[in-house]
Amino acid sequence: MANIKSAKKRAVQSEKARKHNASRRSMMRTFIKKVYAAIEAGDKAAAQKAFNEMQPIVDRQAAKGLIHKNKAARHKANLTAQINKLA
């Protein structure tokens, strides 16, 4: 454990940020999983609706630095391609 006051404060702040980031990352993954579930079910309308809900969430997390912008773009591109493949 840290002995210096500023190091103790940083440890507390880091733990708080870690929990916040974990929560946001989990939320984002849940939205992505909803899109995959709709695709697996073969329901294009539900998949498109879930994608439209997921897209701003992923973009926001990329803008805030939680994930890299290229990872956000990759998620969106892959899901869009899979949705477009549905009949």
UniProtKB/Swiss-Prot annotation:
Q: Name one GO cellular component term.
A: small ribosomal subunit
Question: Would I find Transferase among this entry's keywords?
Answer: no
Gene Ontology MF annotations = small ribosomal subunit rRNA binding; structural constituent of ribosome
Q: Does the keyword Transport apply?
A: no
Residues covered by region (Disordered): 1-26
Q: Which UniProt keywords apply?
A: Ribonucleoprotein, Ribosomal protein, RNA-binding, rRNA-binding
In terms of superkingdom, the source organism counts as Bacteria
Q: Which GO terms describe its biological process?
A: translation
Name the HAMAP family for this protein: Ribosomal_bS20
Indicate the family of this protein.
Answer: Belongs to the bacterial ribosomal protein bS20 family.
- Known role: Binds directly to 16S ribosomal RNA.
Quote the protein name from its UniProt record: Small ribosomal subunit protein bS20
Q: Which organism is it from?
A: Klebsiella pneumoniae (strain 342)
